[in-house]
Amino acid sequence: MSRYHTFTAADAVEYARQFGQVADPQALVTADEIGDGNLNLVFKIRDTAGISRVIVKQALPYVRCVGESWPLTLDRARIEAETLLTHSQFCPQHTVKVLHHDAELAVMVQEDLSDHHIWRHELIQGNYYPQAAEQLGEYLAQTLFHTSDFYQSAQAKKAAVSRYTNPELCQITEDLFFTDPYIEHERNNFDPVLLPEVLSLRQDKALKLAVASLKHRFLSQAEALLHGDIHSGSIFVADGRLKTIDAEFGFYGPIGFDIGTALGNLLLNYCGLPGLAGPRDAAAGREQRLNDVQTVWQTFAARFLALSQEKAQDPALATEGYAAQFLQHVWRDAIGYCGSELIRRTIGLAHVADLDSIDDQEMRRACQRHALSLGRALILVAPHVDDVGGVVARIRQSPSSLTPQRC
């Protein structure tokens, strides 16, 4: 008989007392449910002084925003905990610390990050963290290299691919990224005024062929252990620090996917800034986002190359020049997945505050149109641009990258 039951606040406190690794467990007395997640219960566990000490996170057996009609496997909690533990093995400074997890209860206790802030909120507010982009690039390089064929033995890698098979969560990604936005589907969510742009995407054969290729690679290329949902809402920042959280979508997939979704969220903020700030601040913020895009990729690529030169285990993959050649393919994937993120976050099920929190309706629509046009352009141009500087130059030169005009 399964031990699983949905935690109450009292259950979360008791669990934290047992497994929170705090000096005085009995000082933990209250639990506040937090977060806007659709897949989990998340509790902040506070002590008698009201200070949050640890986080208790439990997977729900269904998608919360839909209900029990959309069931989900609880094994994703094990996959999330083990993904974070594996990533922490190679990049502890940028991965949230898992203190304990129980696969049967689908629960995890992790360090409290109350002294950090969600990066998306900070980007929207115009608060700049100068080391964040470089730290994100470092995290991506360390985690993706060390779980790839460049570092793992073939036997270990094949076993890991099996252990991290995550079909139900991957199905969500497959549908929301690569299928729903390009067909009429009840999960899609967009302002009816955008229908002409949406229909144009659905009727663009070249775009749909490119998206089909991206989906095929997502389905078939087990290159490294991905976070699987790396965006500015799953990244916490503080002065000089960055931590990733929420890895329940972890699986072995194409390396460019994690990079592309990260870059896509920087560009979603880029698209939304004219509606979030005054003209001068928006222009400065947009330039910084483009610099961040360059920094993330350049840091990732430089570190991945250095790691391959120092640590590549397979003699064939250690061949001089191969890692650089491989990164060209990763780059093209990343730009395609980046474009997919822009489109699906604008007209699909799950939106972002970078666009949706814009108060002025006409400006919001203009920013959404920009995100759609930029996403489409990136998907189509991905096979033809060899470096990040070329992509940034095209964004700067494109009329759609200028401040959106009111409709």
UniProtKB/Swiss-Prot annotation:
Entry keywords, A to Z: Amino-acid biosynthesis, ATP-binding, Kinase, Methionine biosynthesis, Nucleotide-binding, Transferase
Keyword ATP-binding among record annotations: yes
Top class in the EC scheme: transferase
Catalytic activity field: 5-(methylsulfanyl)-D-ribose + ATP = 5-(methylsulfanyl)-alpha-D-ribose 1-phosphate + ADP + H(+)
Gene3D superfamilies named among the record's database cross-references: 3.90.1200.10, Phosphorylase Kinase, domain 1
EC numbers for this chain: 2.7.1.100
A GO MF term: S-methyl-5-thioribose kinase activity
A single BP term in Gene Ontology: L-methionine salvage from methylthioadenosine
Chain residues that bind substrate: 229, 344
Name this protein carries in UniProt: Methylthioribose kinase
Matching PANTHER family: METHYLTHIORIBOSE KINASE
Stored Pfam families: APH
Lineage, opening ranks: Bacteria, Pseudomonadati, Pseudomonadota, Gammaproteobacteria, Enterobacterales
Domain of life: Bacteria
Binding positions for ATP per the UniProt entry: 40, 57, 111-113, 246-248
Function as written in the Swiss-Prot or TrEMBL entry: Catalyzes the phosphorylation of methylthioribose into methylthioribose-1-phosphate.
Similarity annotation: Belongs to the methylthioribose kinase family.
Subunit comment: Homodimer.
Associated pathway: Amino-acid biosynthesis; L-methionine biosynthesis via salvage pathway; S-methyl-5-thio-alpha-D-ribose 1-phosphate from S-methyl-5'-thioadenosine (hydrolase route): step 2/2
